A protein has these predicted regions:
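Broad phosphate/nucleotide-binding scaffolds in NTP-utilizing and phosphate-metabolizing enzymes
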Residues: 1-241
Length: 241
């Protein structure tokens, strides 16, 4: 077994152990401490553990109303875009590898990431011709990490515990297996973005980013930069209207 794969399996085991402590905790302080530790572990691992936490937070939104569910939803919501980002230098190296040229020949500037996901992170940048763009760059080595995750889905199910109400883990597992290539190939995501933009072209209240074709690759998705709100803000604002 490769060293990276072994390390990730050990991380899965630690995460499962933390999840077990969360399920067994009968003291609120212990439960909250275990929950925060679990969220931190999921965020650091990225890949499917973080994606599982993201899906769990959305699932819990449909079960709000009791304290345990609300607290769990608030904790797991951090995983939707607040994992520790890779250093800017690492992201630039990945961009240069994907584009086959120095980043200075493409961009005027690029900012450190403030928007991270389970498979990649987003940077705000300005192209040489002055366009503000969103650059989504895939984490280096994430494909191998996800393949390791797929082999250990039993451990990945541990965080669900008593919080899995309304969340169909078996169906989610099948979705991941069926759509793995789409998850990891940003050219396919770009195609979906183009199609969605075409379908909604006449919607005045909907803005769909435009793909920058010449800079989009399997590992990098570049689109126009559009300002917006987080999902939590949207839900909160809609609920008050």
């Amino acid at each position: 077994m490769a060293l990276n794969s072994l390390k990730r399996n050990l991380a899965h085991a630690r995460m499962a152990h933390t999840a077990l402590k969360l399920r067994r905790a009968d003291d609120e302080q212990l439960r909250e401490r275990a929950r925060q530790h679990l969220v931190n572990q999921m965020g650091k691992m990225r890949g499917l553990p973080q994606k599982l936490g993201q899906m769990l937070s959305f699932s819990l939104e449909d079960n709000t109303g009791d304290d345990e569910t609300d607290e769990g939803q608030n904790a797991y919501a951090r995983l939707q875009e607040s994992a520790e980002p890779l250093p800017l230098g690492t992201a630039v190296a990945e961009l240069e590898k994907a584009w086959g040229k120095p980043v200075e020949t493409v961009l005027q500037s690029i900012e450190p990431s403030e928007h991270t996901g389970s498979l990649g992170q987003v940077h705000r940048a300005v192209t040489l011709d002055g366009r503000y763009v969103a650059i989504k760059v895939r984490y280096p080595g994430i494909r191998g990490a996800v393949m390791t995750d797929l082999k250990t889905l039993g451990w990945l199910s541990a965080p669900m515990g008593s919080l899995r109400r309304g969340f169909d883990l078996s169906s989610y597992r099948q979705v991941i297996l069926n759509n793995l290539e789409c998850e990891l190939d940003y050219r396919l995501e770009a195609e979906c973005l183009r199609d969605f933009g075409s379908w909604t072209a006449n919607e005045q209240n909907l803005v769909v980013p435009t793909v920058v074709e010449e800079l989009t690759t399997e590992e990098v998705l570049v689109s126009s930069w559009e300002e917006g709100e987080t999902w939590q803000d949207v839900r909160r604002n809609w609920s008050t209207q």
